């Protein structure tokens, strides 16, 4: 037993890394809190900068692959160009993350449906069709990209997601990690639905959604089954619970898929993994010392 335990612990410490799953990582980060034609927000730019830093520092997103558009940079044209560039740059074994912090809006359609929009800095609520980014565009971009995994994190509330509610594989599925990291994934998590409000507080210095997104990723709190991986599905469940509570039920995050693929966008926190690996090595060293002393006593 003593000889097997170090092997098991060491194997656990050498879990899959980001490089084992993805060849490259790409991100488009958008934050707008100073609008030209609609009300301002307080922390969208700070939220966007925090997420960009977290991706680069903890999750192996190369700085050259992370595009950040803030306030006056986040125009209708620049956002569309950014979406096109990041999605087309990714290759077949890459991942793409798109984060937006700003206003969302919902338009009623003549057929009784609804369309959600992301509002660029110059957006006009009475001219959404010509001044804003429809959610259908996100779905189209996700289908055009070669990337293996794509995740949209939208810190805005609106309806008309144009996505399905399908759930992914259960973590109890045999070879779960192997399956979710090889199959394609097109996933989206939004801060809330139509008629809800993005909650920001000075005591947080963030919105409720991004504050909890940071907690989920930075401290591995989004790793609900403690297997060392944070999947987009786990992230959605974590955000739904925490944001609903912190916002006093003013917003409830929504998680959806654009396709029926069963893959999962995966986050592996390299900083947390270093801590785990160092702890594992210390435990192995301790057990080996005990084994050595036991042999000497015999």
Language-model-derived ranges and their functions:
Residues 2-3, 295:
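N-terminal leader/targeting segments
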Residues 3-12:
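Sec-dependent N-terminal signal peptides
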């Amino acid at each position: 037993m003593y000889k097997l335990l170090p092997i098991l612990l060491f194997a656990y410490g050498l879990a899959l890394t980001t490089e084992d799953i993805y060849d490259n990582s790409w991100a488009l980060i958008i934050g707008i809190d100073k609008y030209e034609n609609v009300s301002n927000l307080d922390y969208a730019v700070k939220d966007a900068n925090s997420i960009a830093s977290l991706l680069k520092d903890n999750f192996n997103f190369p700085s050259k692959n992370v595009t950040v558009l803030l306030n006056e940079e986040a125009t209708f044209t620049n956002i569309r160009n950014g979406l096109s560039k990041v999605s087309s740059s990714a290759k077949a074994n890459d991942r793409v993350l798109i984060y937006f912090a700003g206003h969302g809006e919902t338009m009623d359609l003549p057929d009784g449906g609804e369309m959600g929009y992301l509002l660029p800095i110059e957006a006009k609520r009475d001219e959404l069709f010509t001044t804003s980014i429809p959610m259908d565009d996100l779905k189209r971009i996700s289908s055009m990209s070669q990337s293996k995994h794509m995740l949209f994190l939208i810190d805005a509330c609106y309806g008309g997601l144009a996505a399905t509610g399908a759930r992914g594989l259960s973590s109890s599925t045999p070879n779960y990690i192997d399956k979710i990291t090889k199959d394609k994934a097109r996933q989206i998590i939004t801060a809330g639905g139509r008629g809800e409000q993005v909650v920001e507080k000075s005591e947080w210095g963030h919105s409720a959604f991004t504050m909890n997104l940071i907690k989920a990723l930075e401290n591995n709190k989004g790793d609900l089954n403690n297997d060392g991986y944070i999947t987009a599905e786990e992230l959605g469940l974590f955000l739904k619970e925490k944001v609903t509570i912190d916002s006093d039920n003013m917003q409830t995050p929504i998680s959806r898929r654009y396709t029926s693929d069963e893959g999962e966008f995966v986050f592996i926190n390299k900083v947390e993994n270093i801590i785990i690996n160092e702890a594992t090595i210390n435990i192995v060293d301790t057990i080996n010392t005990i084994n050595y002393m036991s042999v000497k006593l015999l």
